[in-house]
Amino acid sequence: PKTLKDYFDQLDIAIIPQDKTQNPNEIHVKQSSTDADFGKLSTRLPIGKYTLVAIASKKSLEVTITSPTFASFSDEHISDMASVCQEIDVKSGANTVNAVLHRCFTRLVIQSIDKEEWNVDRMVITYKGKFSKSFNPTTGFGIADEQETSYTKNVSLGRPEELTPIKINFSTFIPEETVSLTVDVKLYSADETLVRSHFDDVKVQQGHVTTYTGPLFSAGSSLNFAFDNVSLVKSDYDVSFGD
């Protein structure tokens, strides 16, 4: 069976006393998947109740755990993560705690059904809406500002021997069960915009994947939306677009 290190590169752990008048000291530990004890922690704690917050993620991002209700990543696109927030009741003697981490972000996938064009050098995708790089480990929901956030992702397109369809992932935290985003996709050659696709009311769902599938490289394509009810692995808001 696969272990934590098969999915994630780092593990941030915080053990926070619930009564800081008796014990004000928090424990913060960062582990790497190259560590022999990755996914395990042995420590000494005074008797009492604590809140454990643990976040597994990719090494490309920094993670900060401030409290059981606030943690943040260094970027709005978090790639992949899983977390747990649970109470620990430390009694006298040896205590063993098992914690199961769960993914709690939302993911939007834009999948082309047509192949890359030779004269397209890069893609610029701009996402706008209520999403955040911060989340509440207790609830799993994002902590977003009242104003909408804008995030731009630049993708350089290679020159493979055989051009293929592409897939672009955007993973982030949302503050509610369902949030609507706007997405703007621009394809560039060396000196001009070739194709632009714009999507309004892109619904993403907490803990689910929403996939938009259609032609991105075909100039002049109209948008024809078809909603598809799918399993729990995906959200209920998959969309097909194109002619």
Language model features: what each stretch is:
Residues 218-243:
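Intrinsically disordered, low-complexity repeat and linker tracts
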Residues 4-67, 120-208, 237-243:
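Tryptophan-paired
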Residues 1-19, 62-129:
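Primarily secretory-pathway and cell-envelope proteins
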Residues 32-34, 59-98, 191-220:
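Structured interaction patches on ligand/partner-binding surfaces of diverse proteins
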